[in-house]
Structure formats: structure tokens, C-alpha cells
């Protein structure tokens, strides 16, 4: 599967993910990039994966994507006390999701204009993905976006950034339930391949390979900057982690030759990923509401990409394990713990609410720097894993003004930003919905095909009887197609390669590519 097909496909037909067929080695290239701009490094990284967009057109997409950022460096590095903070919040919605989402939205537009196709993006968000996606595609003629968020489980600012966008192609859906409920509904909808094809559905979150790819870039820019600044030849990086897409991008950068000696995974009290890497325990618990809501997740969408590589790229094993996890079972495999981790590339830790608030207060009082709650989690855990002779790069994933109540409670300071101030008194629009796939399907159908006179079910209604679905068994395999099986996802183009499916049958992936070529873009999204 080529890059553009992978972007539009998003997921394999069975709901699985895409991974690159091969990972390029840039060990001899990145040391020459010290004087390059963010956009130049972005182009040089992406060129190894984007094989079907001409170089000059790719440069135009990149330039358009980052022209919206408020800092000319896009992702500047600030040295604060014992750590170096990579500021990823200078985009339109003040969150790290803008870095990849602006690129993805402009890539969508490029492909759809070229193919004269339309796309209906369906997504769910735990906070920042929703607003970043909405601001990325608002007003784009060939795209509609349907974005679910869990009621009462995002910050007020995050919700306002979504619901105050009134463009005709934007539909905000407020779901009774948790973010994990939203993800479950997404998987159920996108497993219905008939519905996907007939409604031209597409993905914008980190299940879409292009999102992860774009995030790889700032590990190179940030790492090169911090090594240049300190004179060191390697560095560590601490990443606030919920859905595993951000730190997975760091893992890819490491495989590509960037000298990251340790990937530090930081979670809040929703610690499923920290438990996995520390103890090998990937058992799901109840979602806990915290002051870092974008990490309030108990089922990380990108985890199966890591699992695919960890299991030796064995699709059937990944498919079997992830199916068991969806049924409420633990992982049907044991990973030995050595040196406090099941993988020497990773270290992991958790920050409680008290520890998060204490970190916010400490950095405000000691360094006059405000950290948003997610960044504070990363800094707290990162400080626990400082190397003796290596700099620690901590990813700052959101501007503190997105979480004013938490900042005020932690240190008594008002966190403000002009972008946030403009939200006050804004008109909003939002549709309440059940956490049910049939309700979501009906709303999408009524919106796209209004002449059929079907209405969305109100909250409290009984879900409609399920319709027949056409999904592909993750454990199936096939030969003779352009894609081959990977577990519960698929392989996307990289270094001139075609795409491969993690858990979807190869023939099914090939069929999806064919459908895409006929103006039917299929995929899925979670945040």
C-alpha cells in the first residue's frame, strides 16, 4: 500500500492498524541536520516514507501545515532546571496534536483534490485530538468531521475549543460514557465495512499512520537541539502517555538511528501502560478521572503496534492477543522483567494528582515556568530517571492555559493565552449521543443522506437492532495481494515499500485500496 492509500485507509478492514513495511536507518543523515529548520528536517524524515507525493508538493504541504504556528521554530526547546522542555503547544489549539494534525489535514486535502474524492472523518477524543482535528479540517470543502468526546471528561477549555467551531463541515458529538466507550463504538462502526465504504469514512487520530509519522519529526528536532546544546551524544526523553502514539513515534525515531538511550513512559493514575512496562501487567481497570484528562485511558490504541514488533512481527499472535484483551482478558503472554522493565528501551512511572500538583507548584516557584498537568506528569517521572551524563528531554504536550482550574489549584496562578481568552462567550454547538454504534451510524447517515428522513436516537432511547456487518477476521491470512498480515492492524508504506496489515487479511487490505481508488476512503479514529 502506498502512502496516500494508507492515509485514506487509516485502518485495515478488520479495525487493525498500519505499520511501515520497513524502517529506514538515518544514522548517517541526522548528524548533518543541526542547522536545518523544523520544516527542512520534517521533509527529510518524511521523504523516506512518502513515496507517491512529488517532493515539491510534499514541501508545499509541510510549509502550509506549519505556517499556522506561533513560534518560528515550531517546537522550541527550553532548558529548565534539570530538564529540557520540548514545547509542542505553539499550534492553533495549543496542543502537541497540532504538529501532526495540521500535516494530516493538509495531506487529506491534497489527496482528495487530486482524486476528486470526499471524506467523512469520524473520531473520538479524550481532549486535544478533537480540537486539533477540527481546527485542521474546518472549512475544507471535501471533508466533514464527526468528533465524539465523553461528557464531563475533558477540560472546559478543551470542550469549548471543539464545540465553538460552527463551520458547516464540523459535527461535535457528546457521548454518555468514557473515552474508552468512545473507542469501543469507533471499532464497532469501522468493522462494518459496508457502512465504511458507503459513507466514505476516514481517520485522523494516531491510529492513522500519518499521525505517528509526523510526530517522529520532533524527536529528531528536539533531540538534535538538546545534544547540540549540551555537547552530549545521546539523550533520554520523557513522554506523558495515554494512547501510546506519542511515545511510539519516539520509539520509531530510535529505530531510525536517533540516539535515544531511554524512552521514559509517564502516566497518571490510569497506569495500564506503566504497569505493563514495569511489571508485564496489561490488565484493564476502571477509568479514573484525573486533572490530566487526555491520559485518562485504559486501552491504548497504539499498543498493538508495539506488540507487533515485540512479538517478532507475527500478525496472528497479535490478533489473538488483542481479541482476548477486547473480551476483557489479560494478555495471553508473559514478558520477563529485568532491571525494572520488560523492555530495556523503556522506563516507566506514574504521577498521582498530589505529585502532579506539587510539580506544577515547584516549577512555578523555582523557575517561574508553568507546566500543564500532562507535562507535569512527564517532568515528575522524567526526574526519577535522569541519567548521570545524559540530558533529559521532556515533552510539553499542552499550554497550561488549557487547564486553568488545575493550574490555579496547584499554584494559585492564572494561566492565560489570547487563544483561550477569545473562547469566552462563544456560541457552541453539540449533539448528545448514546455510547452506541447504531446511534452513531444513524447520525452520520442522517447528516450525509438527509433525504432518507432518519433521525438520531435521543439519549435514553433503546439502540436499534444491529444491521448485518461485513468485517474481516483478524486471524485470517491471504497471499498474492500487495499487503500481508500483521496482527490487529496493517503495514503502511515506508522507504519505498508497500503496506502490510496487522491482523487483517491481505486480500481485504488490497480490496480497501481498490475501494479508495474509486473515491471511497475507509478508516477509523480514536484519540
Segments from the language model and where they lie:
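PLP-dependent amino-acid enzyme catalytic core
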Residues: 1-460
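Extended hydrophobic/Leu-rich segments
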Residues: 457-459, 493, 527
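Terminal export/targeting leaders at protein ends
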Residues: 464-469
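C-terminal low-complexity, Ser/Thr- and acidic/Pro-rich disordered "stalk" regions positioned immediately N-terminal
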Residues: 470-491
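Membrane-penetrating hydrophobic segments
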Residues: 487-504
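Short, glycine/alanine-rich hydrophobic alpha-helices that insert into or span membranes
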Residues: 500-515
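Membrane-proximal, acidic/low-complexity disordered segments on the non-cytosolic side
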Residues: 515-517, 521-527
